[in-house]
Each structure stands twice: as structure tokens, then as C-alpha cells.
Amino acid sequence: MITGKARVAGVIGWPVGHSRSPRLHGFWLARHGIDGAYVPLAVAPEALERALAALPALGLAGVNVTVPHKEHALARMDALTERARRIGAVNTIVCQSDGRLLGDNTDGFGFLENLRQRRPDWRAGHGPAVVLGAGGAARAVCASLLEAGCPALTLVNRDQGRARALAEALAAWSPVPITLATWDEAPRTLGGAALLVNTTSLGMVGQPPLDLDLRGLAPSALVTDIVYAPLETPLLARARALGLATVDGLGMLLHQGRPGFEAWFGVAPEVDDALRAAVLGKP
């Protein structure tokens, strides 16, 4: 039951109706019997600055930030976590008691925690990683891998200028060697890889499949996709058919929500099969 003392958080985006975050946080609120609510907040780009400035006055505990606002929100924060600064985007905002806005980015955290939960024997230091894509998701994934001890990275992207910009941003704080490759060169980058990550939208419902020959991967390699609709993307299906270990992208969404929920509602939530089923809409 929600009372007049309820703590309220939400997700800001444009559009925001597709977000599964309300289902995720709603599950945790119900599980822990918390007097609180989590609501979708549709905020157009031109209204973002006003919306963020109003959060403390409205008494919100904080918000998640989704497309297209993650990078634009960064400049509107009063303080940033180190990982948000390194990634250059914000996906979690905490309204502090003094009215200041603290910006965080938990996407990389969610990515790593998903791998650790689904494949407990996996370690970032096991070997080089190949990351497909060079957008905002790739930036969070790469930063988290470097922080966790990945010994080398290869960025595969059609737009080499964008890949180069990402590599330079990462090199500003990490000494780990980073190699660039085009899509045509991608199969040749797989031989020594311990991890292959797709951060593009290829394979998502309504998008073309990701066409990549995976036979160059070592039998011990792990393949993961941040796409979770469908849960098993064509990339993961191809990897599984080759006998490779795979991890779907749903857990990244679930785990990235944990730090924000704990900051807003004072409870450290768990990610388990019941939560996965609830977010997927399964009975």
C-alpha cells in the first residue's frame, strides 16, 4: 500500500512506454513491502533541463535515465561518480538530502554482474575481449571490462572514427592495449578472444540479425549479447550451436537497477529467476 510518506522514483526517457524498469522496480517494491512507487516519466529532450531541476522540489528519491537523455543529463549533475565520468553518461540519479543531484552510471556494473551470476567461473582477466559496436553501451561495457582486469580489447565497428574516439577516451585512463577492426576484419579478431560481446542493436526484434562467423572462437570463449528481446538472439543461438558458453542480455538490465534501488529505497535487492520471469511477463 502506498501512503502519504511513500518514496517515489522513476525513469525518464523519450519515449518511455517501452521501458521494463517499472516492472523491475515494482517487483522489488512488492517483494520487500516498501511504501514506495516507481513510475515512467516521459520527458521530451527540450524539457530535460527543467525536469531534472524539478526532481528535488517534487520530493523524488531519484530517477533512472534512458534514451535519449543519458549523455545530456551528465552536464546537469551537481556531482558524478567516477564511473559515470569515465563512461560520459548518466543512467541513475540520486536526489541527495541537500537537493543536489548525484549522477551515476550502472550499466557497466550490470553487465559484469550478469556475467558473474550466470557464469560464476568467468573472470575478465581470462583473456582478451572483442566488443562489437562503439556507442554508449559499448563505452560502459568496455570501461567495466578494463576496470575488472581485461588484458586487451578489440573494438569492431563500421564507423572507425567513432571507434577511434572511444578507444582514445578509454586510453585516457587505462593502459590496456586497444585494437580497432572493421566488420570485414571481425572474424580474424576472434582467435585469441576469451569474450565476445555484442553491444549493437543487431539481432534485436525488428532489426537485421548479426551475421558473424564464430568458428574462429576458442571452445572456452564466452559469447554474450546485451540485447534481451529476443532473449536468445541469432548470435547467441549460433554460439550455442557451436557448443560455446552464452549469456543473454536480460541480466544486465536487472543488475544495473540494483544500485539505484538501494540508494532510493534503502534495501539491497536480489536478482533471481522469479525476477527474470516477472520482467519477462511470465506467470
Curated annotation (Swiss-Prot):
Pathway where it operates: Metabolic intermediate biosynthesis; chorismate biosynthesis; chorismate from D-erythrose 4-phosphate and phosphoenolpyruvate: step 4/7
Keyword Amino-acid biosynthesis included in the entry's annotation: yes
Keywords from the named record: Amino-acid biosynthesis, Aromatic amino acid biosynthesis, NADP, Oxidoreductase
A GO CC term assigned to this protein in UniProt: cytosol
Domain of life: Bacteria
Coiled-coil parts of chain: none
Catalytic activity annotation: shikimate + NADP(+) = 3-dehydroshikimate + NADPH + H(+)
Protein family according to the UniProt entry: Belongs to the shikimate dehydrogenase family.
Assembly: Homodimer.
Entries under HAMAP family matching the protein: Shikimate_DH_AroE
UniProt function note: Involved in the biosynthesis of the chorismate, which leads to the biosynthesis of aromatic amino acids. Catalyzes the reversible NADPH linked reduction of 3-dehydroshikimate (DHSA) to yield shikimate (SA).
Descriptive protein name: Shikimate dehydrogenase (NADP(+))
